[in-house]
Amino acid sequence: MDLSVKSQENVEHMVEAIKEKLRMVNAGAMKAANFDEDMYEDLRDIYDHVMKRETFSISEMQAITEELGTLMKK
C-alpha cells in the first residue's frame, strides 16, 4: 500500500491500524469516514509515530486520541 498517495482507502487503512495498535476500547467512535482527506498529512504523521512504537503509556494514548479527534470532520 502506497501511503504517499492521498486516498480514502489509505485513510481507512491508517485509522484501522492505529485503532488496532492502540487497542482502543471505544474504537467504534473513530471511523475512517469521519476523517477529512485535507488532514491526510497530519494523520500520516500520527500513523507513522504509532507504528514505530511498541508500547504507549496511558497519557500517550490519551494525547494520540485527542490529536486524532482534532483531525475529525466537525
UniProtKB/Swiss-Prot annotation:
<dbReference type="Pfam" id="PF06569">
    <property type="entry name" value="DUF1128"/>
</dbReference>
<protein>
    <recommendedName>
        <fullName>UPF0435 protein Bcer98_0391</fullName>
    </recommendedName>
</protein>
<comment type="similarity">
    <text>Belongs to the UPF0435 family.</text>
</comment>
<dbReference type="InterPro" id="IPR009507">
    <property type="entry name" value="UPF0435"/>
</dbReference>
